[in-house]
UniProtKB/Swiss-Prot annotation:
It comes from the Bacteria. The active site is at 117 (pros-phosphohistidine intermediate). Signal peptide: none annotated. The keyword Nucleotide-binding applies. The lineage of its organism: Bacteria, Pseudomonadati, Pseudomonadota, Gammaproteobacteria, Vibrionales. Keywords: ATP-binding, Cytoplasm, Kinase, Magnesium, Metal-binding, Nucleotide metabolism, Nucleotide-binding, Phosphoprotein, Transferase. It is found in: Cytoplasm. ATP binds at residues 11, 59, 87, 93, 104, 114. Its cofactor is Mg(2+). NCBIfam families: PRK00668.1. Disulfide bonds: none annotated. It comes from Vibrio atlanticus (strain LGP32) (Vibrio splendidus (strain Mel32)). HAMAP family: NDP_kinase. InterPro entries: NDK-like_dom, NDK-like_dom_sf, Nucleoside_diP_kinase, Nucleoside_diP_kinase_AS. This is Nucleoside diphosphate kinase.
Length: 144
C-alpha cells in the first residue's frame, strides 16, 4: 500500500494541559510519522478560512472562539492508510462515544474541547496541509 498523508491538530485544550508529547507518542506508536509540525496561534481570519465549510452553522462562532483561545500544534502525518489510522486513533468526536484507549476517550473534555482534529478524506487532507505548510516545510523521512 502507498504512503498517505493526513493533517492533524492538537487543539488549545490539549496544548494548555501539556498533552502534546503524549499525543505525539501515540501517533508514533501507531506507526505514523510526523513529517512537519509547528505551534501556531490562529487569528480569527485564519480560523474563519480554515473552517470556511462550517460558516453559517450554529457552532461556527464558538468553534472559531475556541480555536483562537490559545496556541495549537499543527502537523502532517505520513504512513500507510494514514487518514483512517489517525481517525481510529483519535476516536469519535464525542468523547463519551469514543472507544477506550483513543485520544479523545482519554483526553477530551467534551465534544467541543475534544483535544484533536484529523482530516476526514484525501481531499480535506491536501487542503488542510496546504493551508498551514508550504511543501518546503514538509520533511518526509526515509523508510526504515
Amino acid at each position: 500500500m502507498a504512503l498517505e498523508r493526513t493533517f492533524s491538530i492538537v487543539k488549545p485544550d490539549a496544548v494548555k494541559r501539556n498533552l502534546v508529547g503524549e499525543i505525539y507518542h501515540r501517533i508514533e506508536k501507531a506507526g505514523l510519522q510526523i513529517i512537519a509540525a509547528k505551534m501556531v496561534s490562529l487569528t480569527e481570519a485564519q480560523a474563519s478560512g480554515f473552517y470556511a465549510e462550517h460558516e453559517g452553522k450554529e457552532f461556527f462562532g464558538p468553534l472559531k472562539e475556541f480555536m483562537t483561545s490559545g496556541p495549537i500544534m499543527v502537523q502532517v502525518l505520513e504512513g500507510e492508510n494514514a487518514i483512517a489510522r489517525y481517525r481510529e486513533l483519535m476516536g469519535k468526536t464525542n468523547p463519551e462515544e469514543a472507544a477506550c484507549g483513543t485520544i479523545r476517550a482519554d483526553y477530551a473534555i467534551s465534544m467541543r474541547y475534544n483535544s484533536v482534529h484529523g482530516s476526514d478524506s484525501p481531499e480535506s487532507a491536501a487542503r488542510e496541509i496546504e493551508f498551514f505548510f508550504p511543501e518546503s516545510e514538509i520533511c518526509p523521512r526515509p523508510a526504515e
